[in-house]
Amino acid sequence: MHFNTLTCVLVGLVAHTSAVPTKREAVNSCLTQAKVPTDAQGSQSWKEDGTAYNLRLPFEPAAIAVPTTVAQVSAAVECGAKHGVAISAKSGGHSYTSLGFGGEDGHLMIELDRMYSVKLAKDGTAKIQPGARLGHVATELWNQGKRALAHGTCPGVGLGGHALHGGYGMVARKHGLTLDLMIGATVVLPTGKVVHCSKTENSDLFWGIRGAGANFGVVVELEFQTFAAPEKITYFDIGLNWDQNTAPQGLYDFQEFGKGMPAEITMQMGVSKNGYSVDGAYIGDEASLRKALQPLVQKFGGVQVTATTVDWMGLVTHFAGAGVNVNPTSASYDAHDNFYASSLAAPALTLAEFKSFVNFVSTTGKSSSHSWWLQMDITGGTYSAVSKPKPSDTAYVHRDTLLLFQFYDSVAATAQYPSDGFNLIKGLRQSISSSLKAGTWGMYANYPDSQIKNDRATEMYWGSNVAKLEAVKAKYDPKNLFRNPQSIKPKA
């Protein structure tokens, strides 16, 4: 009897309070009234748009807006602001920590992949919407005028998040990061107001979106200075038969060559339980590449270099991988993984630091049951375009570092990610970072690490630029509407 009475009381309370709409109901009603297209919860489109790339980190949005115009984006933002619902923009959805969803439940997610226009002007500038995926950007710039942008190699990655937080790829040392080629942008602010920014217009906002772009609003169009697509570009790889004794010196020699290598070379060291290998790209023909690589090949002891010269789209296709669609435009694009990743942007390492790293790889790494891998890119060096700007020139701060590591471990899509994977990836990173001085290293915002807390994350991603970013945040988003667990907070 007491149970029944309590049940009736609870039902009465529920009935009494249900007249007050929840934030979810309120924001969805607002979107409907504003005629903003949305995904109905439980629909096929909700399932497609609402399934995170990283299956380890699923989050449930309060609503999914699917705009096709800037006016609809503006109206959606106004709805989120009106009802106090945090907002996150999702371009391609490839965030390692599901930041397109907000990195937590309950956000208004603005799905931008229906906005993927690429327009090349006669003067070589391009206006591109954030939902354009990198392979589509490359294809359109090539088809419209044999032009190109510096960007990453995965064709399904959306331009928005990629360009607004860095954008490292196979011609970065010659042309810079994707954000280095940005000359302007159109942004929907937290009020719904649409503004333009460049070096001469809202310059503080333009500074902030080049490295920390998710923190201030929804960037609905990006403007770039493109370059003529190389007529000849050569991709290459170098097989290495190293062991625990020879790898430290080999890695050190690779680094030392990288310090002064020509800007035309962009290359990376791959490391896994299977060993070590180099791959990269050279702007030019095979004969010129082999001449440029000769000092490194001699250091490596006469290793075999495999090289192929292609045109720009040949390079894009090669690094996309076999059987991958290099021009994805479908809203039902469906790529997923179940993984944990981290990163390290580091100065030049000593031989002792490489020994520490190799010891970890050869013991804990090799004995692990995990299928981990890592990449060590030489992003800097005397002739690198990435290193030319000062750390304070853009919100992207890692201009003085030489190396960029990406650490990655994945399991089957249906598996529960095992807790020892976190320690493995952390151990790989700390085998290097533990001996580095504070302030000399950081982490890359496009390889976000879900296991670090907010203040530490902002310090790692944006370093000496955090204070200025907090001031810009306070000016443009004082109520912290655009937020996630690792975002910039408004300066008090």
From Swiss-Prot:
Molecular-function GO terms, alphabetical: FAD binding; oxidoreductase activity
PTM description: The FAD cofactor is bound via a bicovalent 6-S-cysteinyl, 8alpha-N1-histidyl FAD linkage.
Crosslinked positions (6-(S-cysteinyl)-8alpha-(pros-histidyl)-FAD (His-Cys)): H94-C154
GO cellular component term, pick one: extracellular region
Reactions catalysed, as given in the entry: N,N'-diacetylchitobiose + O2 = N,N'-diacetylchitobiono-1,5-lactone + H2O2; N,N',N''-triacetylchitotriose + O2 = N,N',N''-triacetylchitotriono-1,5-lactone + H2O2; N,N',N'',N'''-tetraacetylchitotetraose + O2 = N,N',N'',N'''-tetraacetylchitotetraono-1,5-lactone + H2O2
Cofactor annotation: FAD
EC category name: oxidoreductase
Signal peptide: 1-19
A Pfam family that the UniProt record links to this protein: FAD_binding_4
Stretches assigned to the FAD-binding PCMH-type domain: 57-229
Keyword terms, alphabetized: FAD, Flavoprotein, Oxidoreductase, Secreted, Signal
Co-factor: note: Binds 1 FAD per subunit in a bicovalent manner.
Family to which the UniProt record says this protein belongs: Belongs to the oxygen-dependent FAD-linked oxidoreductase family.
Protein name, UniProt field: Chitooligosaccharide oxidase
UniProt source species: Gibberella zeae (strain ATCC MYA-4620 / CBS 123657 / FGSC 9075 / NRRL 31084 / PH-1)
Encoding gene per record: chitO
